[in-house]
Amino acid sequence: LETLILTPKKLYLAIKYHPDHANRPLIEALCAAFERCGWQSVVVARDLEGWGEKAFNPRDLMRESFRLIDTCAGLVVEISEKGVGVGIEAGYAHARGLPILTLLQPQADLPETLKGISTRVARYTLADLQGNVSAWLDHF
């Protein structure tokens, strides 16, 4: 039986994924900003799927996603582009009592349900991302 170890400074990034990895630069920019603040990140497309090298059926993907969330100290939701999986991951993290930082770009709509379970909501641009990440993560 595999033992899960909670890593105090590890975040799960919930974000809409694309088969062509069109938002990989955004994912990498977010993760780099977290890492500069001393936080490890877990990203399904990178860490489970190896940027398309490995595929999962939906049931196994969600099971593995939940397993990874259980090893993290918090969840960061990037909701500029909506996705059903993102909402499922956020709901799971909330049910587990994890803090949730919701990030979205200035033009994006914030779902009221996600706002209701978020520890903090912040709008950002890539230009101001690094300067704000440390303050946002103080809540974790």
Task: List where the protein language model places each region.
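Conserved catalytic or regulatory cores that recognize and/or transform ribose-phosphate-containing ligands
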Residues: 1-140
